[in-house]
Structures are given as C-alpha cells and as structure tokens.
Amino acid sequence: MSAKVPSNATFKNKEKPQEVRKANIIAARSVADAIRTSLGPKGMDKMIKTSRGEIIISNDGHTILKQMAILHPVARMLVEVSAAQDSEAGDGTTSVVILTGALLGAAERLLNKGIHPTIIADSFQSAAKRSVDILLEMCHKVSLSDREQLVRAASTSLSSKIVSQYSSFLAPLAVDSVLKISDENSKNVDLNDIRLVKKVGGTIDDTEMIDGVVLTQTAIKSAGGPTRKEKAKIGLIQFQISPPKPDTENNIIVNDYRQMDKILKEERAYLLNICKKIKKAKCNVLLIQKSILRDAVNDLALHFLSKLNIMVVKDIEREEIEFLSKGLGCKPIADIELFTEDRLGSADLVEEIDSDGSKIVRVTGIRNNNARPTVSVVIRGANNMIIDETERSLHDALCVIRCLVKERGLIAGGGAPEIEISRRLSKEARSMEGVQAFIWQEFASALEVIPTTLAENAGLNSIKVVTELRSKHENGELNDGISVRRSGTTNTYEEHILQPVLVSTSAITLASECVKSILRIDDIAFSR
C-alpha cells in the first residue's frame, strides 16, 4: 500500500495572493495619484474640510494625506511613508508618495511577467542603494558658513507653496533661525528650539524673528502691575497663588462674623506669605502655569505682587513649560518652599509690546548658562488659513536647512537627479544577467515619474521634455532639469534650483522599503 501523499493545497490556489497584491497596489497607487497634481512650483493646492468643520488649504503632501479619510490599510502605509519623510527630511513628502506609486506600477508590470515578488522587492532595495550612492557622487559639498547657498535651498523649498512670492523674505529668516541655534560642528538641529508663534493681523511681510522667547500671553495689568522689566529674574511656577481648596467636596458653616473675619485674614496672610517668599528670591517676573482646578492667581495676590513690583504673566500652557525652562534657563517650581534664586532664569529685558494690533511678551538678552539658544518667529497673516499654511511652509524651509546640517550636500532640483539615476541604472542593467536586469530597468523607468509630473504640472509636453533631458544627461550635462521659469530644460544648479541631497536619498530609500513591505503581503486577515 503506497504512503499517503501530504496535501499541498496551500500552494495550489495561486490566484488569491495575486488578487490581494493587485488590490493593494491599486489602493496605494490611487493615493499617490490623488496628490500627484500638487508636486512642484506649478502644483495645485488641495482644500480639505476636517471633521470639525475647519478648512485647510495646502499643497504639502504630508498635511493632505494626514487629513484624508483613508480606510484601506495598505493605502495608510503611504501616509506613514509621507510622515517618515517629514520627520527625516521635512521636505519631499509629496515626491516620496509619487515615487512609491510609480515603483508599485513597475512592480505590477513585473508581477504580470511572472517574476516572484520577493525577488522584485530585493532587487528594488539593491537599486535604491545604488541610487543613493549615485546621488552622493553627484552632490556639491556645502558649508554652513555659505549663507547664500543655504538661502537658495530654502527658497527652492518655498517656491511650490502659497507663500512663494515671500520666499525672498522667509528663506533668509529660516536660515538665520537655524544658524542661531547650531554651529559649524553640529550634526543635527533640534527644531523644537525654534518656536513658531502665530498671530492674526498684519501681512506675511510683518513676520519677524526674535532672538529670544516670545509669549502669546500678556502681562496682567488689572492690579497696576509692571509691563516692562530690565535685568529680569524670571520664575516659572506650577502652583497656584490663590486660596487652597480641599480635594473633597465640603462646606464650612460660619455662624459668627468674627469667624468670617478670621477666614479672610488667614487668606490674606497665606497669599502675602507666598508673595513675600517670591520677592525674597529676588524674582521680578513671574510666569504662572494654567490651572483648571482653581484660579492660577486671584485678584488679592495680583494686588500684593504689583505692590512688590513683580510682573505677572499667567495661563502658561503645560506644553510650553519644557520650551520655556529650556529657553530661559529656569527650572519649573511646583512648591513655594522650593522657590529659590538658583531656580530662576535671567534676561536683560522682558517687555510687553504691541505688534500689529495684538500684544505679545518678548524676552531678550537671556543670560543664563543653563539656557540653550532659542529663537522665536512671530508669524503674521490676514487670517488663520494663511497663517497655518505659512507655518507649514516655514517648517519645510527650516527642515531643508536642518538636512544640510545633517548631510552637507546640495544637488540640482527640477528632476535632474532622478533623470541621472535613471540613466545610470539603465546603463548598469544592460551589463547584468537574468531577472535582475529586467527589475533594475523598471526601477530606472519608474524614477522618471518625478520629472514627468513636474513637466505635466507646469503645462509642458512631458514626453518632449523628458526625452530632451535624457539626451542632455547622455552628453554629460548632469545638472540639467526642468525650469518652470524658462518653461523648458536648463542647468538647474546654475538657476539656483537646489535641494539637499538628504531629501532625495531619504525619499528613494523610504519608497523602496514601503514597496518591499507591500509586495510581501499575500493576504489580509481581519481580527475579531
């Protein structure tokens, strides 16, 4: 009797994994196609209405995808890729999604030829690694002291935004902000040291950089307290200067006016004691954290503080505490017994200023050794939509400069690096054998989606432009790309259309990793 042959049903149904892969690729590509029109300086903007009824107008890839109601789990992976690009490079969030979509299209064509998805994924990874090497060969080294080059890179980032007409003003502002908090030896920049403060009123031209700290809260003047302090000693407190309340709900029954008088006297003595301890520590500017349980500071305490000539700013948000303690060099104080002079920050000047119809408190000349260099940028605009988009654009420009601190190399923009990588990979693929040659060829073709999209969005003939670029790169003109200003191809490096090399290397690496993850999925199971 012959032995029973084990069942091989798992591998008999080959259609299901193919269908799942096809559905995943279609879902992911539909997301890429949705934001493809917003790439480049002539790219369109998207208007998004949030579930809360807010209106957002933006052409920042990450912002658009983050707000879109995407249900398909694989399509959500593209949102995560965009978020990863945003945190790694800050710019190129649209490019990375378009590139992922194009690589998935190439993978679909290869799958239809019967090539195994794991082989495709691994070859894409090796092609991406080679692409990064080519980009690093192409890049022009840049020094942080070369301010002009940094400004040009920031201007290129701003050129595709609504605020592009203000790029000559915002780009130097972004460069100066980053250079203030970094030095020639820095390998990274913490953008949390740059505080973007949004204030409605005025125009984008009124946006200013302040070397110090800006508070959106105003000084309290109701009790006649000061609004300007020179040689300031700043205290940041997290307790309330108001009568204490018990934790449990209870009532106090007063049946004699003398008892009432005693309660009021105790209250005065309690508050006066706190105010005297603050004055004893030589504090003359007091920042008080917002409280939801009771008044952060009551009228009687304000009266005492104004008599002691102490400037008071209340309602400091919990999220601001870390930045303020870092920027002012003061330590947050949670109890009056811990209020000592060594926990205070010091500054040359703290003053409330009137800026375009709204008041802000400005702290300049911070002189504490514990303080890290911080910069505040006050963003102005006619309405919240413009201010929000200006903030996003400025964040992208700051990220571009941060990229140049991390990896000090600039490459030409306008699709020039993608065309060059495509040409070099195609050439190398011809000398390969077997399936890998096919896959590298498809990877090279997929990279041309960036210059093609730039040309289409600029209203140019994409086939003619990309063919022209190919022949120019074949003749050794490595920096030739698409210039929207000239409505054709030109040396984009000489036209000052520049981008950090880290933006492109990060986009290609992340796109190939995402494609690898998607191709390796052969089934979707829903848990209960």
UniProtKB/Swiss-Prot annotation:
Organism in which the protein naturally occurs? Saccharomyces cerevisiae (strain ATCC 204508 / S288c) (Baker's yeast)
The record's section on Pfam families has:
Cpn60_TCP1
Whichever gene encodes this chain, its name is: CCT4
Provide the assembly information. Answer: Heterooligomeric complex of about 850 to 900 kDa that forms two stacked rings, 12 to 16 nm in diameter.
Origin: domain of life: Eukaryota
Please give the family membership noted in the entry.
Belongs to the TCP-1 chaperonin family.
The protein's matches in PANTHER family, at most eight in alphabetical order, are given as: CHAPERONIN
The regions listed as transmembrane in this protein's record are none
Instruction: From the Swiss-Prot or TrEMBL record, give the protein name.
Output: T-complex protein 1 subunit delta
Family matches, as InterPro entries: Chap_CCT_delta, Chaperone_TCP-1, Chaperonin_TCP-1_CS, Cpn60/GroEL/TCP-1, GroEL-like_apical_dom_sf, GROEL-like_equatorial_sf, TCP-1-like_intermed_sf, TCP-1_chaperonin
Q: Where in the cell is it found?
A: Cytoplasm
Q: Spell out the NCBIfam families in the cross-references.
A: chap_CCT_delta (TIGR02342), thermosome_alpha (NF041082), thermosome_beta (NF041083)
**Among its keywords, does the record have Nucleotide-binding?**
yes
What biological process terms from GO does the record include? Answer: chaperone mediated protein folding independent of cofactor; protein folding
Q: Which UniProt keywords apply?
A: ATP-binding, Chaperone, Cytoplasm, Nucleotide-binding
